[in-house]
């Protein structure tokens, strides 16, 4: 078996491969446009300290939670610890059964 270059047997294939290489090289070696660097102006920079101290419950970043935890026992905690084999409470499904 005689090994030859692909372009020797199929001249059009060699030419199309060469053109493909040229197009890929032109696309990959083209300089990329630089993105404009956005900087924050001096007048928009935030103060390092708050003017008024926050009162109440805040986290490490000084953000107050929207819904703080309620005080006292949770009523659904005992119901959540039921066993699976106990089955559902049918009184919850038929709320008008006591009427």
From Swiss-Prot:
The transmembrane residues are 7-29
**Which subcellular locations apply to this protein?**
Endoplasmic reticulum membrane
UniProt KW Phosphoprotein keyword:
no
A GO term for molecular function: protein-macromolecule adaptor activity
Ordered alphabetically, the record's keywords are: Endoplasmic reticulum, Membrane, Transmembrane, Transmembrane helix
Classification via Pfam families? Frey
GO cellular component entries? endoplasmic reticulum membrane
GO terms, biological process: fusion of sperm to egg plasma membrane involved in single fertilization; gene expression; maintenance of protein localization in endoplasmic reticulum; protein N-linked glycosylation; protein stabilization; protein ubiquitination; protein-containing complex assembly; sperm-egg recognition
Q: Where is this region: Disordered?
A: 65-88
- Subunit organization: Interacts with SPPL2C (via active sites); the interaction stabilizes FREY1 protein and inhibits SPPL2C proteolytic activity. Interacts with IZUMO1; the interaction retains IZUMO1 at the endoplasmic reticulum membrane and coordinates IZUMO1 complex assembly.
Write the protein's name: Protein Frey
Q: Which gene encodes it?
A: FREY1
């Amino acid at each position: 078996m005689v090994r030859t270059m692909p372009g020797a047997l199929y001249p059009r294939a060699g030419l199309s491969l060469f053109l493909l290489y040229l197009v890929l090289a032109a696309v990959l070696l083209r300089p990329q446009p630089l993105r404009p660097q956005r900087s924050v102006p001096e007048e928009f920079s935030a103060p390092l300290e708050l003017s008024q101290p926050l009162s109440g419950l805040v986290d490490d970043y000084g953000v107050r939670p929207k819904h703080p935890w309620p005080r006292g026992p949770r009523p659904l905690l005992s119901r959540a610890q039921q066993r699976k084999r106990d089955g559902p409470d049918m009184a919850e499904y038929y709320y008008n059964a006591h009427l």
